[in-house]
Structures are given as C-alpha cells and as structure tokens.
Amino acid sequence: MLIVADENIPLLDAFFAGFGEIRRVPGRSIDRATVEQADVLLVRSVTNVNRALLEGSKVRFVGTCTIGTDHLDLDYFNEAGITWSSAPGCNARGVVDYVLGSLMTLAEIEGVDLRERTYGVIGAGEVGGRLIKVLKGLGWNVKVCDPPRQAAEGGDYVSLEQIIAQCDVISLHTPLTRSGDGATWHLFDEQRLQQLKPGAWLINAARGPVVDNTALREVLLEREDLQAVLDVWEAEPQVDVSLAELCVLATPHIAGYSLDGKQRGTAQIYQAYCDFIGEPASIQLGDLLPAPWLSEVSLHADSDPAWALAMLCRGVYDPRRDDADFRRTLLGSVGEQRAAFDVLRKQYPSRREIEGLKVRIEGDSPALRQIVAALGAVAV
C-alpha cells in the first residue's frame, strides 16, 4: 500500500509505517502524478484536494492534519466514495496561546490594562470556544458573534455590528466560506475596518481572506490608532510586505504550530484511518510526546496578577521571536519571500502548550489561582 503524505506532517513513521510505504512530498508540490498510485493521501492546509487532483487515482482515504477543511472538496469525496477525516481541535490550544501571547505583547506596547478592555470573539468553534472560556475565566468582558451557532442553539450572542461598535479587541476564528448567508470571505472589508473603535486591536489567526488585506493596508495607513496582528495572509505564501510592515505582530501562519497540536493532528488522522480499515489503534500520542522544556513555575502569593499572567503566557509562547524571524524574510525578492514562508513553517522550533505547564503558588492568592485555572495550567 502507498501512502503519499505532506513531508511536514510529524510522526508519520511512528503512526503509519506499519501500514505500507510512505512517500513524503512538499505539500505545495502534490499533483496528479504524485497521487495516481496512492491508496492514502495525508495533507495539511497548503494542499487543495479536489477532483482535478484525485480523479483517476487509487486514493480511497484522505486525511488532513488540520482543523479546517476549506482545502478539501467534500462534495467530490462523497461523489467518488472517498473517505476523509480532518483533525478537529488538534491545534486549537496552540492558537489560543498565540492570541494570549499577542495580547500580552500589545498590552506592554500600548501600556493598557487588559482587564479594562472589551473582547469580541468572532467564531465560537474549536478555537474560538476555547479562547472564550479562557477570557471569561480571567473575568474579562467578552462578547461573542457566531450566527450559525446562534441560529442552531440560541444563547448569548451578539451581532457583528455590535462587536465592531463595542469591542476594543477583536479576534477572528471563523472558517473560510465564500458563498451563502454566512460567507466569511472578506468579512472585514473596508467599510467594517473603518468602523472599528478608536484604538481597536484586530487579530486574525483564522484564514487570511477573512480580512480584505488590501483594505486593511489602506485603513492602517489612514488610522494610526488601530493595531493589527496577522498570522494568516490572503495570498500566502506570498505576503503583502507593506501590510506586514504596518502590523504590530506579523507571523507566517504558525499560530497553531505547537508541538502538541501538530502531533495531535497526526494522531487523530491515524485514529480515523484505523476506524476506516476496521483495526484497533495501538499507538498512543502520550507515549510519543517529549517532556516540555518548561515544565513547572513557582509564583509567590504576593506576585502582581497582571505580571504573573503575562509571565505565564509569554513564558510558554512569546510571538515576538516569530515576528522577528518573519520580518527578516520580507527583505528579499518575491520568490525568496514565498520560499522563506514555507521554510519558517517547515523548520519551526518546538513549542509547547500552556495546558501542560505546572504552576506552584507559594502562599494563598485567589487572584493567582483564578489565572492558573483560567489558563488551563496545572495547579500543584
């Protein structure tokens, strides 16, 4: 059996070597010739898997080690009888850590108290839902916009217009959809960007085209009061350099790139494939994850809560390093920039999640206990 897989998927041998030959290919280079004789195709979001790629091939199972599925033609899969699986929630915590690290950096730059801001989360799925839980756990004022969930479940949701009018911080966590009433392509167009509150922060760690990049560039040039954090780009791996230069933080689509998240994605696809072939899963991710480099932190009960929160978040993940690495690649030609975008992702250093961090509090501090619980860290 032949398994064609994106070369950047971790733990391929550990999970899939027992099933057959693994052929590793750069994700953007996977084409019809590559998959023609493949039985299984394993991809990430950089590979569009559709009729043009698969028709006439032997592929019967497609797995994407990502939360999103906008790069998969699910209608064609159903028509062709191809079983598929994504990895819902696999990197959700990594994205939450990215947003938290970004908030800590913005607060330091702007000199603001994060407790006094109003937060708007657009999209309450795997990522947005976890972020909402953390922010509310910290006792912060959070408003949520998710029209599909509101229609299906009811609940305490607000409109997009209310988010824009009332929120100081807006974090985007929607899938990318191009048609229908809930289309998210260019959800933030020039009109909505112009309507942002004075001094608002906009964070996009969802999909690049959710924000009109050209419009955002023009609005940032006009309104110096706004701050933008972008991890995703409309034409990636090509990046609008002039837009990146206007962002307070700019990174190459690595928000969810925690080691835990990447390996969790492979584990979920492995489980799905075992279900597909009717065999029990014999390999467990917990047996493969290495020990985190930062495993335990001690805080004195007298520690300032705002300082402790920033220290815990940025101790696990500080986006400024990724921002600096990314900006260095923007000095080359367009071709060099495109290549560097993928190199940064392929060679991304090991990064762990805050949920694996043990926190010891010396003495009694309800405020610190609240922070540790909200972050999902382990109190010891």
Swiss-Prot record:
The cross-references to InterPro entries, in alphabetical order and at most eight, read: D-isomer_2_OHA_DH_cat_dom, D-isomer_DH_CS, D-isomer_DH_NAD-bd, Erythronate-4-P_DHase, Erythronate-4-P_DHase_dimer, NAD(P)-bd_dom_sf, PdxB_dimer_sf
Q: In which pathway does it act?
A: Cofactor biosynthesis; pyridoxine 5'-phosphate biosynthesis; pyridoxine 5'-phosphate from D-erythrose 4-phosphate: step 2/5
One GO BP annotation is:
'de novo' pyridoxal 5'-phosphate biosynthetic process
Known EC number: 1.1.1.290
Keywords recorded for this protein, A-Z: Cytoplasm, NAD, Oxidoreductase, Pyridoxine biosynthesis
Q: Tell me if Cytoplasm is a UniProt keyword of this record.
A: yes
In this chain, NAD(+) is annotated as bound at 146, 174, 231, 256
- The lineage's top-level taxon is Bacteria
- Top enzyme class of this protein? oxidoreductase
Q: Name one GO cellular component term.
A: cytosol
| The name this protein goes by in its record | Erythronate-4-phosphate dehydrogenase
